[in-house]
Amino acid sequence: NASFLALPIFIAASNTNESFALLEFIGIGIWASALIFESVADFQKLLFLRNMKKAKKYNQVCNIGLWKYCRHPNYFAEWMVWNGIIIMAIPSFLNLGALEISFLNSELSTILWGFVGFGMLYASRMMYVTLVYTTGAVPSEHFSALKREGYKDYQRSTNRFFPGPKKVN
C-alpha cells in the first residue's frame, strides 16, 4: 500500500527541529549512497546490454561490476533508499511520541504512535517482499533461467539480493 511507503517521508517532513539529529545524517547518507549504488547498477546493466547487442550476443548473463556481487544490485539499492528514509524519519517519529495530542487521550495517543512506528518498519518489509518476491527478483529470475544459458550457474554462485562474495559450491 502506498500509504505505508509514504509514511516515513511524511514523518520526516513533520520534523519541527531546526537542527539535524545524528540519525537524520545517517539516514541521508544511506539514502544518497544507495541512490548512487542503484544508478551505477542500472548504468552497468545498460552498458552490458548495449555491448551484447553490438556483439550480437543475446541472452547473456550480466555478471559485471556490481552484478558480480549479487544478482539484483539495483533492487537491493532501491530497498536501501527506503531504509535510509526510514532511518532519517526516526528522530521525527520519536518527537511525535513526545508530543501531547490534545484531542486524543494518552492511551489512544500511545496506540496511534505504536501504529505509526509499526507502519514505518512495515514499509521496509513491504518493499523487500515486493522487490524480491512479488514484482522483482523471483519473477524475473524464472524467465532469465529459461532464456539465458549459464543463468543457473550464476544463481548458484551469486547472492540473490544482498551483495557479498561469490558462494562456494
Predicted segments — roles?
Residues 47-49:
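Membrane-interface helix/loop boundary segments of multi-pass membrane proteins
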Residues 1-5, 9-44, 53-169:
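Hydrophobic transmembrane alpha-helices
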